[in-house]
């Protein structure tokens, strides 16, 4: 995996192309089970390189040992183009593989990714989904004081339960 990480860190399209031609294994994972594609998202590789990986067989439906999906990684690293690509190619915006029940909308809310929240809402994401502790995306947005996200979600700042959160 070290060779992959080195190439991805440099966003080296030609290096990836050559490594793949030389027989590189796209199914390699890092210490925490992240795929090459997930590592490319973490390295903030451009869309051309990400598409090269996908067209070469990288699994867009992959997730790591904690259940963090490629969609989650795209949200974390604010890759709007990849979020759109994943949804257009069958990614279920309501599916989570995390044991905690943490969803893509919750991730977008935590990180204040308003543009991604809009995309998820346009694709019928469930705003009412709760994680194992009973928290929803609105709860995460309130906790993190993400006002731009709260403005997009079903949030009533005048509701008494919301008085100690963002206004």
Q: Positions of the model-derived regions?
A:
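Ankyrin-repeat-protein effector appendages
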Residues: 1-6, 123, 132-135, 139-167
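Ankyrin repeat A-helix N-terminal signature
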Residues: 6-12, 39-46, 73-79, 107-113, ...
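Alpha-helical adaptor scaffolds
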Residues: 41-42, 64-90, 94-99
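Ankyrin-repeat and related helical/solenoid repeat scaffolds used for protein-protein interactions
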Residues: 94-139
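Ankyrin-repeat boundary/"N-cap" motif
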Residues: 1-4, 29-37, 63-69, 96-103, ...
